A protein has these predicted regions:
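Structural motif
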Residues: 13-14, 162-163, 232
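Conserved N-terminal Rossmann-fold NAD(P)-binding element of oxidoreductases
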Residues: 229, 233-236
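Domain-length cofactor-binding catalytic modules of enzymes
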Residues: 26-226
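Functional cores that coordinate and move charged inorganic groups
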Residues: 1-40, 45
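Short beta-strand segments
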Residues: 8-11, 111, 157-159, 236
């Protein structure tokens, strides 16, 4: 039998193997490059719109931050992204559908939640519905001894305008921004190249989100949190 060089783990990613660490890394580069070339060839001349509409009003962004903070149980920082990449994603005709399929890789769920918030014309109604849907998701898949995490979104799509990310501090916000950037870039490519993609189902994602070892990562981060994080103070 030929020696196995790599393995595709469905709905997760790719692994490469070798007794030598450097050669294992080189195999990773080789296989990922092969995939990138295939995707590029499949996309061909297909393009999606990067046009930018007027940005959301500052008062709307402030309202979004306020309501998300209330559901989160702490003041959150928010970042609005209307870069070409963010607008290209927000302009997808089926953005609500593609954004609501799940994370690209399951372990992202502890940072980004299973799906983002998609904001419609009624801001409060959109955010409240997201939170209520999360509570239903928890009740559907949880067992009695589990404690629900907060139901607030970690990122949001403003159709036609851009992307919002949320975090209780700069570190969390940066992590979410980084994950979302790679997520939307990959979704755009898979939509253009293959006409779609599929995430792990909700029940499996719930198991990962509430898996003890994954929760330990968040608890460790929370133990180092500061008492006034996310707050603004005026010193006179």
């Amino acid at each position: 039998m030929k020696k196995v060089e790599g393995m595709i783990l469905m709905n997760h990613g790719i692994f490469t193997f070798h007794d030598d660490a450097k050669k294992s890394y080189q195999l990773m580069i080789k296989l990922v490059t092969k995939a990138e070339r295939f995707i590029k060839k499949s996309i061909g001349s297909k393009k999606s719109s990067k046009s930018k509409s007027s940005p959301p009003k500052a008062s709307d962004l402030s309202l979004i931050r306020k309501i998300v903070s209330e559901w989160r149980g702490c003041p959150v920082n928010s970042h609005f992204d209307n870069s070409d990449l963010a607008c290209e994603f927000a302009n997808l005709k089926n953005v609500t559908s593609v954004a609501s399929r799940g994370p690209l890789t399951p372990d992202h769920v502890i940072r980004t939640k299973r799906i983002p918030l998609v904001i419609a014309s009624d801001i409060k109604k959109s955010i409240d519905k997201y939170a209520v849907d999360y509570i239903k998701y928890f009740n559907k898949y949880s067992s009695n001894e589990m404690t629900m995490l907060d139901p607030a979104p970690r990122w949001a799509v403003l159709p036609g305008k851009g992307i919002l990310t949320f975090g209780c501090n700069k570190k969390e916000l940066t992590i979410v921004k980084d994950i979302v950037k790679h997520t939307i870039k990959t979704i755009i490519k898979t939509e253009l190249a293959f006409g779609g993609w599929k995430a792990l189902n909700a029940s499996k994602l719930f198991e990962i989100e509430y898996w003890e070892l994954e929760q330990a990562k968040l608890k460790k981060a929370e133990s180092n949190s500061l008492p006034h994080k996310g707050k603004v103070a005026i010193v006179t």
